[in-house]
Amino acid sequence: MPIAEEEKLLPLTQRWPRTSKFLLSGCAATVAELATFPLDLTKTRLQMQGEAALARLGDGAVDSAPYRGMVRTALGIVQEEGFLKLWQGVTPAIYRHVVYSGGRMVTYEHLREVVFGKSEDKHYPLWKSVIGGMMAGVIGQFLANPTDLVKVQMQMEGKRRLEGKPLRFRGVHHAFAKILAEGGIRGLWAGWIPNIQRAALVNMGDLTTYDTVKHYLVLNTPLEDNISTHGLSSLCSGLVASILGTPADVIKSRIMNQPRDKQGRGLLYKSSADCLIQAVQGEGFLSLYKGFLPSWLRMTPWSMVFWLTYEKIREMSGVSPF
């Protein structure tokens, strides 16, 4: 039988392995995002509270922030905006994670298997995993930056309504169109530098930790490549990713949400370094960990749901384990 005919008989996952992995990771990310999104919204609102730089614009939000703490913030959203507002911005978040998760997973596996090369005994040095995780995060996040920008800005719409400010967007597609009209293509990549910095750190924590812990457990303990190993590995990856990524996440959220002039330039911060300095000087070092608790409480179950779902649908689709 000709080679072309044999290829046609192969399952789709073997004929288009990277496309399949992209789609499978997108499906797993969608499940995880829907399950944990309220914590992401709460985290974003917390990160914006007490933003010292707003005082330069005479914004009263600094003194009138209605919430303090994770629980009161979440309850306040439910009481004042409605229960379903806990999922405000979930549509662009799903768009973002399909692109982001698909991009990072395909990139990481390509680097691991082809560029750096895992040894025959499945040993993969930590330093290679760190570099691979960071590079995968950078590429995945750069591709997904427009959707992340829309998600962050839509998450703050409920707060604007409470402060008596006009809403900026009528929906997801209007948000994309408005940002594009006001800032051009470059406007869709506002905040991309702190965004990829955060993604590099988060994926160094998530991908590197999961891959390293999982294969350590499989190779050095009685545990097999099953749901127990996946669960333990994802718990570790969620914690490390939250610790490494929260400061960059605070900076990213503030830069993306800041008001802009007619040229699309930020009115509060010149760069991610400027935002970092202003936050520490105006609010203290711990301001970089605003929203850490909901971030950790979200990252851990998100990581668990994602990895358990991803490993399972890979198995069901005939794709080798991660």
Swiss-Prot record:
Residue spans crossing the bilayer: 22-39, 87-108, 126-143, 194-211, 228-247, 287-310
UniProt GO molecular function: chloride transmembrane transporter activity; protein homodimerization activity; proton transmembrane transporter activity
UniProt keyword Nucleus, yes or no: no
Extent of the Solcar repeats: 20-114, 124-216, 225-316
Pfam families referenced in this protein's UniProt entry, alphabetically: Mito_carr (PF00153)
Reactions catalysed, as given in the entry: H(+)(in) = H(+)(out); chloride(in) = chloride(out)
Recorded superkingdom: Eukaryota
Compartmental location: Mitochondrion inner membrane; Cell projection, Neuron projection
Record's bilayer topology term: Multi-pass membrane protein
GO annotation (BP), single: negative regulation of neuron apoptotic process
Main location: mitochondrion
Keywords, comma-separated and alphabetical: Cell projection, Membrane, Mitochondrion, Mitochondrion inner membrane, Repeat, Transmembrane, Transmembrane helix, Transport
GO cellular component, one term: apical part of cell
Function: Facilitates proton transport across the inner mitochondrial membrane and may dissipate excessive proton gradient associated with oxidative and metabolic stress at neuronal synapses. Regulates glutamate-induced proton conductance in astrocytes, shifting the energy metabolism toward aerobic glycolysis and lactate transfer to neurons for ATP synthesis. Can transport chloride ions with lower efficiency. The transport mechanism remains to be elucidated.
Subunit details: Homotetramer.
Similarity annotation: Belongs to the mitochondrial carrier (TC 2.A.29) family.
UniProt name for this protein: Mitochondrial uncoupling protein 4
Organism: Mus musculus
